[in-house]
Amino acid sequence: MTQISRRKALGAAAATAGVLAPTIVRAQQTTRLKIQTAVPSSSIYFDLLKRFGERVDKMSGGHLKLEMLPDGAVVNAFEILDAVDKGVVDGGYAWTHYWSGKNTASGLLSNPAAGAGTGLDQLSHVAWLFQGGGYALYKKLYAEAMKVNVEPILLQPMGPDPLGWFKSPINSLDDMKKLKYRSPPGLVGEIFKEMGINAVAMPGGEIVPAAQRGVLDAAEWIGPADDMALGFHTVFKHYYLQGLHQSTDVGEVLFNKTAWNKLTPELKAIVETAAMASMTDTYTYNVYRNAAAVQKLKTDFKVEIHDTPKDIFPAFIKATNVIYDREAQKNALFKEILESQRAFAKVVVPYWTKINGLYYNMGLASPNAV
């Protein structure tokens, strides 16, 4: 190699190193984000969130770490969106219906009551999100309707939620009307009130203490495993499994948009992929853990498991349609989302109901039928 060629080669190598060096430095940096959750550390969903964070950590080679904070560590559950928007915390975890006070359309995305009155179950609701245009409407809620500095990502389908826990058994809707009942916030609470039920909202960690003080007669939270972890069985001995109020219930992680935009495209893709993995993780986790929890509640804690009184179902669906149709007249985004769900349901529900009938009848015919 000539002297000139050697100088050119060395110059090219130096130039290449100069271009690559900043990339290498960035790749070696570790970003740490604190995520304020709406669940206590005893919740199984807190554990699932930590598993989500562990996936992000491993997939990023340790360059992105998400620290999960239990409910109330920095702000309480209903303040999470504002805290993420303002950068008080880097991210948050809750459900979209927690922000119903900002826009009622939020409830249609995480937990449309009675499948938005369309017959959509949890899996078909998630199918609407990913195959029916629902995810774009989800993003539109935050970016255009609420105009918050937030990047939202769905990650935990945890329903269907039971009607809930009762101190005394009920046999009808009239019995339930006599009780003070903890329900989710937003339009679901309005639906219960339309039915004549005295419904109040409060964070999950406050429910058992309120029941112990006699403030509540009945309550719903999430499901058998998580509710047992929070000690519901210590104050309630009657559990009603079928609940229309959250026939689906999808959690979300919210990132402060400024913090999110500082992540590389690769790190953003890792978070989004880990969130999709968390979907499967939550589905499979719930099937077994909730079934095992019901057995334990019956055998170890003498909780009586009941079917929900039949007259609650038509009353709930009727009240849902009243509240939703009324809200659609006032809120353009609510109307857009509801119409999208109804159009999707017309295609999916006839087929999916028949398929679900297979599994229902197969279960009844099995030696494990109850």
Give short role names for the model-derived ranges.
Residues T2-H125, A145-V370:
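N-terminal secretory/targeting leader peptides
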Residues Y142:
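Extracellular C-type lectin-like domains
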Residues L120-Y138:
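A gly/proline- and charged-residue-enriched helix-loop-helix capping module
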